[in-house]
Structures are given as structure tokens and as C-alpha cells.
Amino acid sequence: MHTIEQIFINGEFVTPHGTERFDLYNPATAQVIGQVRLADEVDAERAIAAAKAAFPAWSQTTKLERIAALKRMHAAVAARHDALLEAVIEEYGAPASRSAWMASYPAEVIAQAIEALEVFEFVTPAGAATVQMTPLGVAGLITPWNSDAGFICGKLAAALAAGCTAVIKPSEMSALQTQIVTEALRDAALPPGVFNIVTGRGETVGETLSRHPDVAKISFTGSTNTGKAILRNAAESFKRVTLELGGKSPTILLDDVDLARAIPLVIQAGFMNSGQACVAGTRILVPQSRKAEMEIALAQAVAAVKSGDPRESATEIGPMVSEKQWLRVQGYIRKGLDEGARLLAGGEGRPDGTRDGWFVRPTLFTDVNNQMTIAREEIFGPVLCIIPYQDEAEAVAIANDTEYGLSAIVLGRDTGRARRVAQQIVSGRVLVNTLAHEPKAPFGGFKHSGVGREMGEWGIGAFMEPKSIVG
């Protein structure tokens, strides 16, 4: 059993004022594997005070000093790779294909921030003026359970690169990852108060961060509903806010697509992170003229996807993170059937060969229209919908007929045509014949998928405001 009794404030591990214990589960077995003691509002206020006190000195550090600090962070986090790998399997149920990436990404995203900082221009001319990028102050960083260690490191690296100090509220469901990352960051020998990590509930620690007048910036990744609440709270003190929220991403298969090349990309995009990804391509738009052919190919591919023990090398989809999430996904599968969608693969219940744990059968629906619940709401599980279109214009219209706009994919043999389609999609990121990630490019959403951008120079700039000096 893992027992986590401390949080990190002002350069040291301390016992929280909060007394609530939160059970940690292994989702592959549905068994309790530990407990974490949660922080409360008092702890959050202590962390904010520490970050506020550290800000004047940190904001005056040079670019070279910040680069050196980030390099120490990178080395310390990279050294904990094996411990992170075990944690993401044990507390998250990530299969081998995903857990290897999740264990490497926290260090990788710090390295990406170092590259962005090395070329970032803090002072630029603008006519007769000089524009100086100025750090905002204390940043509240709120991270989700579906890639907690990576988000902690990515948001913190960008904030520190900009000259901000930080209070981090990680997901209480990811306490093992958080503990490992916190220990690593402590070993990086950053000045006390520059970063503080306070594990607690959103309605206590998160609420305090989003309302506190001494917090100048909030960077949040999570659900759209929580993002709306943060925006309302932040408005009271005019906080700057970056929100990376939900999605219902379309994958458009054009009528000239090579299915042998496209189907593996469709499956990987739809089922990434066991379907628990905001960018998952869960709406598969297919031309009516090739619908029958594509249904067969997709049904065969989904049926071949193995859901089960994350420690088995053949497993491609692990369990849902919690019983609550498992029940949510089951409810959406029932809703799809009730609304008249036709099941091509999967369905309710657990996959064959699994008895315990929160496993879901990889599921594929067809005869779906874009007004059905399963086509409009973010399910956050391995459930895909085939939606037919008559022509290219209708494909674009269906892709854009959503309150979300985080990510999209266009697959077709004619790359020029696919890029023209991509330009018409209202989304923060559109991938054309690839699933590659470009860390130098901005990442974030349109519409209800968020506010602002992360990654690259945009990620650093999000923690700053431009100051014009004339004369």
C-alpha cells in the first residue's frame, strides 16, 4: 500500500492542514493500492503566499539562469523514468504502448520548453517603441489525471521560463505520479517557493487558486464544465486564463483514401490513451459512396483491438481510470443503441477474458447522424461513430457542427486536396495524413475546447503580458 502524507510548499515537504484521505485504485483490478492525504484551502493559501514571495527574485532571473534551472529539472525528471513507468501502469492502467510514452513525456516536454526558451525574444522593437514581455506573477496550474506528470512538467516549465512562480494542483487520482515528479523537481534545486505542489480537490484547492487575488494566471487542462467555472471565478480579479478543454474530434476519410494506410491511423487516433484523450478522433466521417467498404474494414480493425491487462504486451486498450468513468462509458453505449445507432463491434460490458477492473469493450457504431448524443458529447472512452457524408462540403459541415474545436484529422491520397479541406475545419489543430505532434506549434482549441494556446513560444508567452516602452 502506498501512503502519501505530504505536500510541497516553499521548498520542502510539509504535512497538509487538510485531513481528508483519498483512496488510490489500480483500475485494472479495481483494488485500493494506497491513500493520499489531501490539502485544503489553508494549504492552498500557504502555497500562494510562498509563490508570491518568490516571484520578485525569480522574475528578475536571466534567460540563461532559467535555462540552467530547466536543464536541472529535465535531468532530475528523466532520472525517474522507471518509477514513472510503474506508476502510470499501477494507478492509471496505461498499456505498454502508452505507458512508455507517458513515462518519457514529462522529461521530453521540459526539453521542448528549453528549446522554446532559447529562441524566445523577451524584448522586440515595434516602430519607435520597445516591447518588453513581462511575467504575470503567480500562476495556478491545474492538471488532469489522464497525463498528470506530463502536464505538471509542461505547464511548470513554461511558467518558469516566462519568469512566473507557480502553485500546482494536480489530480488527486494521480498521486503516485505526482509524488515521483515532486521528488524529482525538489532534486533540481530550484529556489524555495518558485514551485509548490498541493494535491487536493478541485472544489477546495482549485477553487482557491481560481479566486485568489494574488494568483495572476490560471492554466487548466480538463473538462469544459470545469473550465467554465474557472473562467467565472477568474473574471472577478481579471486573471489571465489558458484553458485546454474537451473535444469531439472528427476524422475525415476522403473518397480517394488508401484504406490500408488510413485504417491504422483511424484506430490509433480514436483509441489513443484507451479513448481517454481530449484529442481522440471519435467521429469518423466516411463518404457515402464507400461507406459499406469502410464499415467492413473498420469493424475488422476494432474487433482486433485487445482490451485487457496493461502489463501484457498485446494489450492496446487498458481500463477506464475509475468506476465512475466505466459507468459513464457504459451509459453512452446504451444511449447509442437507444437512439438507433447500429453496433458493428464491441458493446456493453467487459471484454472477454477480463473479470475485475474497469475494462471496456472497444466499440464501433454506424448509422450515426451528427445530432445523436454519441456524436455530440465527449464520451472519454473507446467508443467510435461512423457518420456518412455525401460530398466534401458536407464533410466539412459535419466536422464543424460541434461545440468543440480542439483537433481534427483529414486522410486522403491527394495531399493538396486534404490540406484544402483541413483549412476549412474550425479547430486548433488539424492533422493531414499523420498523427505526428509538433511541439514548436501552438496547441489549444476553438469554441468550447478552450482559451489560449500552449506549447512552443506561445506556451511561454501565455504567462506574460507585453509592455510598450516609448521614448
Set out the residue ranges of the language-model regions.
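N-terminal Rossmann-like NAD(P)+-binding subdomain of aldehyde/semialdehyde dehydrogenases
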Residues: 1-127, 321
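Rossmann-like NAD(P) dinucleotide-binding subdomain of oxidoreductase/dehydrogenase enzymes
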Residues: 120-261, 389
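ALDH superfamily catalytic-core signature
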Residues: 225-368, 432
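Short, well-ordered beta-strand elements within core beta-sheets of diverse protein domains
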Residues: 33-39, 54-60, 140-141, 251-254, ...
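Conserved C-terminal structural/oligomerization subdomain of aldehyde/semialdehyde dehydrogenase
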Residues: 29-35, 215, 252, 306, ...
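Residue-level signal for inorganic ion chemistry
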Residues: 30, 66, 88, 163, ...
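Structural signal for hydrophobic packing residues in well-ordered secondary-structure cores
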Residues: 55, 59, 74-81, 85-88, ...
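Residues at or immediately preceding the N-termini of alpha-helices
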Residues: 27, 41-44, 63, 259, ...
